[in-house]
């Protein structure tokens, strides 16, 4: 994880932007074939933009996205995120924040802010349907990637 420092409980202390970029650049320089980078870089990752060859955004209905987040969090942290657990409050705040993604403005990481950021990318952009099957989405990425060569 480039964004968060390793802490317990996790996801509570952000790395300084300079350190995030340093770690990512080091990793990207190591890869000979290419790298798939997952996550939102808007607001801090602009120095990496020249290295992008394709940008992919996965969209899915809010209810599906939130259920997937809940399931992921429960699988990763178990009882720690349930009422009485040491991560319960952080998890509750995270889910409230995530629920605002589709409707929030640029004051937080949101769909609106990410769409605006994407307009400045010099590489092709692809929007995938998160409700589609994995194989279908991988095929669309490969098809778009093939156009780049």
Where is each model-derived feature located?
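Loop/turn-to-beta-strand initiation segments
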Residues: 31-35
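A short, aliphatic-rich alpha-helical micro-motif
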Residues: 28-30, 49-50
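Switch II of P-loop NTPase G domains
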Residues: 40-47
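Short, structured coil segments at secondary-structure junctions
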Residues: 51-52, 121
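NTP-dependent small-molecule kinase module
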Residues: 96-149
